[in-house]
Amino acid sequence: MDKEVLTLVNMLNDKYVHVYKDEHNNIIVDGTIIIFDKEYDEFPVKIHKVNGSINWYGHISSDPCGSLKSLKNFPDIVTGNVYIFNNPKLTSLDGCPKEIYGSLICDHCNISDISGIASKINNNFIASNNPISDISALENITVGGNIELIDTPWANAHKNDIKNASIIAEKNIQETIFD
């Protein structure tokens, strides 16, 4: 087995996920990747495509302690959702997949920089409970669903004066502040 493929197979340790290289030598993952607070702070090898979703959870407790700190080596394409929860070392979306067929959900991390966001998200972009204060990166992307920035500095600062899009901005209240 190829060394890069073996490295990823050992990391994932999931018999329901198939990892292989395509005819262009790109790493492809068939199946949903689920990572629960392992010692990894990023994927160890570059993945081209995941035919499924990525769920990278920090430790589910009152203390956020997830180990993910970089989206380096994340796939270029994800045919499902990308869900990153409770990873306070993650501060940026640099390395984010370029195209996500489902939703991108980054909740309870420490993301302040979204400039590396995917160019196309077919469903929702949710980045609640992060210190995001600048959303100008959203001007050049396609989001097929809602954008939710609940309990972020940006949402709190703009909840009364924003018009013309569909963003939910107030914690615990689904108030559409754009038309």
Model segments located where?
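The feature captures the LRR N-terminal capping module
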Residues: 1-49, 53, 165-179
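Leucine-rich solenoid repeat scaffolds
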Residues: 127-179
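LRR N-terminal entry segment and analogous cap-like coil->beta motifs
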Residues: 21-90, 95, 99-102, 106
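Per-repeat beta-strand-to-loop junction in leucine-rich repeat
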Residues: 85-86, 107, 128, 150
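Intrinsic-disorder/low-complexity detector
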Residues: 73, 121-123
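Short, conserved loop/helix-junction motifs that constitute active-site signature segments
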Residues: 98, 119-120, 140-142
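Per-repeat structural element of leucine-rich repeats
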Residues: 67-70, 89-92, 112-116, 133-137, ...
